[in-house]
Amino acid sequence: MILSQQKYNYLAKVSDSNGVISALAFDQRGALKCLMAQYQMKEPTVAQMEELKVLVSEELTPYASSILLDPEYGLPAAQARDREAGLLLAYEKTGYDANTTSRLPDCLVDWSIKRLKEAGADAVKFLLYYDVDGDPQVNVQKQAYIERIGSECQAEDIPFFLEILTYDETISNNSSVEFAKVKVHKVNDAMKVFSAERFGIDVLKVEVPVNMVYVEGFAEGEVVYSKEEAAQAFREQEASTDLPYIYLSAGVSAELFQETLVFAHKAGAKFNGVLCGRATWAGSVQVYMEEGKEAARQWLRTSGLQNINELNKVLKTTASPWTEKVSVG
């Protein structure tokens, strides 16, 4: 893949010195509200959401190559990040319409790539829900939407990270055995679609191609994939794209995510880092809501720091530098 010099420089800012993206994800909005709402009767306030994001940014960005935030609640946290840490900003509205299976994408209406760049972004992230077997007319709309964002990023000469969350229009539960059986195809074929040059994507942020809780040796209940079938799924994922790609943590535990990265590497996946969210900071939410700011800070300085240090240690031996996949032109 050929990158402009400026895009290359921006990507270097969100990566570590080895060319690996060890980024912290805290662009959650709807999901964060739901997490916080478990611990108080009324809806979480803007001030609470902003303050927790600031705490996580202050305490954990010294140990991350960059942080992904949203411009709705995350700009104070962007200002609070470590000066060596890069900044990715999310461009999509949170959530989707649960009354339809189409899950059409939507940008934040008062933002543009130009404005995100002016707010200090080193890269822009957009989340897309995609079913490769879904309604063809819906998928054409989604592809056209991504082309527009790719063109915007090209015009502003800023890296475009596309996050693909796969689903099946006919399966309501992504954690089910039923979805686990089709996940390899859903994830890897979506990556093939969006690796086309026309979309202007620089980095894919993707799911691992199997649900690890159904993999032999990891499963506590039903097994959907043998270890070899799971390893083959990771090899097929590696063959699905020439673009740099990074893994999202999908809300699994820190321990399972780290074990997954080791498994992926052994299988032959040359992934280029992670954008890890809840696996790192989720435990701070309850502490913040029940015990307050300083208790949450203490949790982040102990458990949160341990999570991110352990993840960084795993990345050192499993992730490949994206610099091997790109050249400047």
Curated annotation (Swiss-Prot):
| Superkingdom field | Bacteria
Q: From the UniProt record, which GO molecular function terms apply?
A: 6-deoxy-6-sulfofructose-1-phosphate aldolase activity; tagatose-6-phosphate kinase activity; tagatose-bisphosphate aldolase activity
EC number from the UniProt entry: 4.1.2.40
Asked if Transmembrane helix is a keyword of the record, the answer is no
The protein's matches in Gene3D superfamilies, at most eight in alphabetical order, are given as: Aldolase class I
Which pathway does the UniProt entry assign to this protein? Answer: Carbohydrate metabolism; D-tagatose 6-phosphate degradation; D-glyceraldehyde 3-phosphate and glycerone phosphate from D-tagatose 6-phosphate: step 2/2
Name the top EC class.
lyase
Instruction: Please give one Pfam family short name.
Output: DeoC
Q: Which catalytic reaction applies to this protein?
A: D-tagatofuranose 1,6-bisphosphate = D-glyceraldehyde 3-phosphate + dihydroxyacetone phosphate
Q: Which UniProt keywords apply?
A: Lactose metabolism, Lyase
What InterPro entries does UniProt report for this protein, alphabetically? Aldolase_TIM, DeoC/FbaB/LacD_aldolase, LacD_aldolase, Tag_1.6-dipho_adolase
GO BP terms, alphabetized: 6-sulfoquinovose(1-) catabolic process; D-tagatose 6-phosphate catabolic process; lactose catabolic process via tagatose-6-phosphate
The protein's matches in PANTHER family, at most eight in alphabetical order, are given as: SULFOFRUCTOSEPHOSPHATE ALDOLASE (PTHR39340:SF1)
NCBIfam families xref list: lacD, PRK04161.1, PRK12399.1, PRK12858.1
Xref: HAMAP family: LacD
Q: Which family does it belong to?
A: Belongs to the aldolase LacD family.
User: What is this protein identified as?
Assistant: Tagatose 1,6-diphosphate aldolase 2
